[in-house]
Amino acid sequence: MKIAIIGTGISGLTCGYYLHQQHDITLFEANDYIGGHTATVDVRVGNEDYAIDTGFIVYNDRTYPNFIKMMNEIGVEGIPTQMSFSVRNDGNGLEYNGHTLTTLFAQKRNWLNPKFYRFILEILRFNKLAKASATEQISSSQTLGAFLDEHQFSDFFSDNYILPMGAAIWSSSLADMRAFPLMFFLRFFLNHGLLDVMNRPQWYVIKGGSRAYIPSLTQGFADKIRLNSPVEKVVRSEQGVAIYANGQCEWFDEVIFACHSDQALAMLSDASSCENDILSNMAYQANDVVLHTDTSVLPKRKSAWASWNYLLEGGEEGLQRLPSLTYNMNILQHIDSSHTFCVTLNRTEDIDENKILRQFTYHHPVFTMESIAAQQRKEEIQGAQHTWFCGAYWYNGFHEDGVRSALDVVKGVAAKHNEKSDTLYEQGAA
């Protein structure tokens, strides 16, 4: 079959990898590069060259089974890394890093602060309660904020721990995290070991930067990728699909939208009511991302520096603003340098412009009650009118989810044409 794949992020490349041997595929990419959020940047600082990841950075051995299986198949290695989380609250002066007991008390006065000990006890209480609740039947309309209120967690705990951690994971504001679907939140935290003090998954980075897997993954179909080829519109008929790109029209038997949900909907000139209802309820949000060497956005105490560092302002404005998060790439990628390489979201105005190396805008899926409901309706549109949809937005929004959703499509295409696909999936927590 002739299959068009629109988008070359992890979902599109996974489809290409598993489909190219049996089918005549063509991948359309609007940009002049492939990889989507797999974006490693080469920079030269102080007469030294560095390769810094700015999008997809880490994966773990517990909840990325399909991604790991694919990396093993193409011979790409991972390097163990440290996963730690810090909070700096400029509204109340709090700083901590939850990695070890020493870093937890990086702010020495907290050893004598009863409020901080109550804070630690609340973390343990939340973990225990969340574990129990995650296995129960929870209403699809219940929110994280309602759960916190119902069980009388303090604002100090919510605003300095669980809301910033969730906001860091899903690139949401603190206010949006209060409205976050509770069951989605609890199951994710449970599966990723975030409700355990011990027994957490081992995290990894790709050796040589995340882009290192792309040449090996695309080796068999690199000549099928068309860069600088934004798809203008897609028109379906009973016979197949017409793809309009670069002023030309080309016919295919099937089309796979391996792009964001809103992008797919915009390309469909004849979207069905189901496609419109489902895809329009899975929105994306833009986040400003800066690669730089300005450590002023990290905790003031170096002992509190973590892999992920959340900066809070306090007050109503702080609740509403997009997450202010900095990845310390020296820790994550084991970079040995006198310069500290940071990747910061949504804090561009506070970064010394003389220390900015690159700037980007990345779009991340927004998870709401409506989007979770839309996820459950995927089968209503999957495969209809010769059309398939994949992307991380169908699950939790991460790299494994992009792979998993692509495998759903590959399996669906195979089933439609009586081909074998049973060996594609690995078992793992969602």
Ranges and model annotations:
Residues 20-44:
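Glycine-rich FAD pyrophosphate-binding loop
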Residues 41-67:
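N-terminal glycine-rich dinucleotide-binding loop that anchors FAD/FMN and/or NAD(P) in oxidoreductases
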Residues 61-182:
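Mobile amphipathic helical/loop "lid" adjacent to a hydrophobic cofactor/ligand pocket
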Residues 11, 33, 262:
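Conserved Rossmann-like nucleotide-cofactor binding loop
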Residues 230-363:
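Mid-domain catalytic core of redox enzymes
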Residues 185-243:
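Helical element adjacent to the flavin cofactor pocket in flavoenzyme catalytic cores
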